[in-house]
């Protein structure tokens, strides 16, 4: 709409149908200011509604709580009774051959693929940020506040991330590993972990 108006006025000016009095007039300046403002408002209102609707998952298949600490993550599967664990980076001296240095953890976050997952994120001490770029997720972890994000994995695989908020001396030693598996594998994993934590 704006481009069409500009081209129309440019054509009128080139054909000399607009006099210098019209071009320099306050009415034209007022139109040049108000019309783009109205167009921007008409674009912004639906965009904001869509932005908020995209962030909400009404009924996720799984809710996961991630708590940032200096310098590890705690995960709680809130849909299960006793399913929680701490996830620390595997030191380079203990890293198995073929694994990524500074990215591998002792306990991965396992999620079922093709299921909407809600992650509730907070921190226990200082600011952190739960970021997994390949899933398009980055959410700040703030002490005393619950932030949420969501994602759906469409294929099995391992997705790596990091704390992306400088949180102290060992900030770069807070990797995040999300493992996406078929639902049956996830159910087997969760029942094994629940059984071992209840011992």
Curated annotation (Swiss-Prot):
Its main location: mitochondrion. The chain crosses the membrane at residues 1-13, 27-54. The keyword Kinase does not apply. It catalyses: 4 Fe(II)-[cytochrome c] + O2 + 8 H(+)(in) = 4 Fe(III)-[cytochrome c] + 2 H2O + 4 H(+)(out). It is found in: Mitochondrion inner membrane. It holds the Pfam family COX2. CDD domains: CcO_II_C (cd13912). One of its GO terms (cellular component) is respiratory chain complex IV. Component of the cytochrome c oxidase, the last enzyme in the mitochondrial electron transport chain which drives oxidative phosphorylation. The respiratory chain contains 3 multisubunit complexes succinate dehydrogenase (complex II, CII), ubiquinol-cytochrome c oxidoreductase (cytochrome b-c1 complex, complex III, CIII) and cytochrome c oxidase (complex IV, CIV), that cooperate to transfer electrons derived from NADH and succinate to molecular oxygen, creating an electrochemical gradient over the inner membrane that drives transmembrane transport and the ATP synthase. Belongs to the cytochrome c oxidase subunit 2 family. This is Cytochrome c oxidase subunit 2. It comes from Dromaius novaehollandiae (Emu). The lineage of its organism: Eukaryota, Metazoa, Chordata, Craniata, Vertebrata.
């Amino acid at each position: 709409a704006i481009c069409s108006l500009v081209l129309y006025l440019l054509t009128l000016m080139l054909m000399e149908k607009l006099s210098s009095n019209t071009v320099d007039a306050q009415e034209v300046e007022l139109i040049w200011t108000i019309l783009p403002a109205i167009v921007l408002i008409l674009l912004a209102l639906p965009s904001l509604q869509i932005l908020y609707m995209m962030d909400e998952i009404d009924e996720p298949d799984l809710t996961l709580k991630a708590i940032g600490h200096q310098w590890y993550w705690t995960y709680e599967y809130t849909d299960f009774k006793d399913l929680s664990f701490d996830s620390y980076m595997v030191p380079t001296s203990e890293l198995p051959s073929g694994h990524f240095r500074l990215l591998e953890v002792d306990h991965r976050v396992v999620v079922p693929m093709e299921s909407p997952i809600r992650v509730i994120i907070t921190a226990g001490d200082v600011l952190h940020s739960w970021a997994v770029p390949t899933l398009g997720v980055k959410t700040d972890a703030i002490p005393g506040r619950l932030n949420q994000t969501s994602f759906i994995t469409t294929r099995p695989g391992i997705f790596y991330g990091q704390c992306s908020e400088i949180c102290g001396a060992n900030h770069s030693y807070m990797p995040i590993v999300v493992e996406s598996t078929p639902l049956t594998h996830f159910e087997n994993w969760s029942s094994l972990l629940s059984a071992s934590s209840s011992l």
